[in-house]
């Protein structure tokens, strides 16, 4: 294989990464050699240990600088000219690259809203990748640039705290240049590696002979983009990986990319660790946090023991070690202590390190709108949170995760000031999760005990099932089964399937030989003329249309074409189809006149605009973690699914509705500009992607002042006042972490309010003569809801429920009198509100119910004196059956009950 501007066909074997590595290695002068290597005296060698090619300026070096070919040489012996903490390292990096023509841009969210296939940001280049109808494009705010991108990765969670280097969150200091050679500011391999050397050698002071560059290749899974890459190592640690996106596969042909991209991922944490040389990276990465945690937990480890342990901690990588027990013994032997001593000495410290990492990960995720749940990316956040809580409980550490998160936020404020903004909201989310975990633990004790007593084999499948169905972690099982060995890849398997998602496309198959339909629906046109381009069964394809097609969760318009009813409108790709009742009356090429149903369009626009207002109001009332998780806009009602960590209370629902209607009364103009995607992201932020990533270069923005701004293709009002009013019907928790709000707007809201008033009148009917005038004449929907809550029923069931309770209340009075109790007269309830009346009725109902049971019990006990004392079984059956008979009918003869008892008792 060789790659030139001229296409060259690949024949014979299938392209693989291994094949590319071999071919790139043969032509290393073309793909890996750069000017800096010549200038600094670097030569290419093959590692005698691993066989990989590397570049060094040390003529005596015969082994590369990767581990395990060499041990870490910087531990307790850093070779940099200074020690920089987490923030200082970024400032050093930022200053150098800004001086060399790069723009420093703020980090992007760790919860990815712009890629349809990923939940979390896992690399800095991801910030600038946009998927357009299956094609990858780049959108960037500057060129070249650097970014301190926080990334979340969960496959190695079981190693965090153990190996001394693994993390669930880290900063990838991204160095990127786009579009070489056509874009201004872009550069490629020579300048990239020159900057690499100048920073590491010149700014950090790493001797040139200690910098080793190792050849590799990077490729997209489908080889849509690939190229050589150069990994920079020093003393066993990889510091940076420089990727040169240079080529692409095209069928059986290969060619240069039209524009090349520099994708350099600097390991920020590794640079910090390397310059400080602490035995475990965690002691240098989290500033004062690990010191505070150790002191608070009383964790002390002999420095000599820990130094020896840290040198071999990497061998406990649970993702690579097959026999972890054997590996632990080997480590203990190397350190010179028993396995028991190792466990008692090191494991509490490992827990402290893991908690420091996990709390920071949760802080970033929750600041950016992520919440723990049992679905999607939230699943991984719950795994992290519960692992931290399990460590706190296991070692009785007494830590407060939110307090630790605040320490992180304070320490990182110079880099990430936004972490200060969501601490209160994080506290609410974490406390709700702690309550859920506590309830889970109460329920699981019996389950685990039963499994252990049966000597159940806890294999991978069972452990996964127990976690996913009941939230039972291996750490919990170990409390009952101390010898349990957790599968080395347990958390990797759990989190892997929740790290990405597959999005289904909308609209079905593409229609061949038909141009995209011109859309008139956004112009508020309700009549139009068009030409029929194609007829498919009962569906007409027009060159232009004012009908809105079902999409984005919104129902379609209806109306007529030449007076014939249009019953459905839908999309296939960019083509819109109109289903008509009499397609035989139309022919291709015919001119038709279309009329859109104005009333339906108005109601749909009101409901859709209400969706945006409700979303904004929910975010303001509940917190910034609220994001749209789905929506549906119909004529009869709308629904909005939002991310939230608990059920929404009636009070919160009322506040949301009140805020929505306040915005309606204010008459906010609804702007609908079409904005280039990059500019929209910069101007409005990633909140515009409420409905998920949009595969278009230009976004239609629905802007309701500063209250809510979203990218949306639906039909909307022109001013919030046109929505008229919104009535929220109900809130339902549809899955863990997602709450569904159902509501109506405009005339439908008026109709719903009238229906509630009618319900109020029905509720009052059985109260006539029992309540004061204030209850009969007063009307409050909020008070009606409170009355329904008294009986734990939906509002719609309040009239029949109240009638039933009043009836039973009266029946109890008659029965009490029949069993010799005092006669209870009907009374007038003096409460001035319906909810208070409901509370009194329910309270009196319970009192009468108890009094009646006591009287019946007393009667039955008297009757039992007639039964033989030496037949306890018969007496027991009699008591239960007689109570039941008399509660049903106070006149049930004793003989009838006795007859049934004798049959049962034999």
Predicted regions and their residues:
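Short, flexible, mixed-charge glycine/proline-rich loop motifs
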Residues: 34-43, 53-58
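Structured aminoacyl-transfer and RNA-binding surfaces used for tRNA recognition/handling
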Residues: 74-382, 392-405, 440, 709
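Non-catalytic interaction/regulatory segments
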Residues: 635-636, 642-735
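Short cysteine-rich clusters marking metal-coordination/redox-active sites
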Residues: 47-50, 64
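Terminal appendage regions of diverse proteins
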Residues: 395, 458-469, 474, 480-481, ...
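Extended, domain-scale alpha-helical bundle/helix-rich regions
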Residues: 391-397, 429-509
